[in-house]
Amino acid sequence: MQARAQGQARASSPARAQAQPPSLRGRALRLLGRREFSRAELESRLRPHTESPEELHALLDELAERGGLSDTRFAEALVRQRKDRYGKRAIAQRLKQAGVSAEDTAAALTGMDADTEFHTACALLQRKFRHPPTDDKEKARQVRFLQARGYTIGTTLRVLKASVTAPDC
């Protein structure tokens, strides 16, 4: 008897799912419930689901007023998430792509000074390569790796020099 009741419940659920698509607000809250979004990112995600740009901007303004949407909070979360794997330049570029203002970007990156960046680059290089470069080809490979991760050439060369003299930086 219980199996039949479950079967009937399953049969009615597809009809219920087709009844009404989620509202714009529901979509926004579902996305924001998963992770932080910048205003520009959330707008681009929601734009295909609305006919009226005014409705979308009104919703985004309301979410920002209520504290559900914050570029500052998004920037801080992104920096926290990426600071151990990427340099300041790469993180700043990602924030710029996400539409975060220069002021919010600068505020979020204040904790990443040159020494912090040096130590994270050192740790990253040790995890990836384990040994200092033995020839020019290997050195170029390690330089490219750190450059692709957003570290400046100055930091990269300091890290390589330190890894040769003291393998544990």
Summary of predicted features, one role per range:
Residues 1-169:
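An alpha-helical, amphipathic repeat domain used for nucleic-acid recognition
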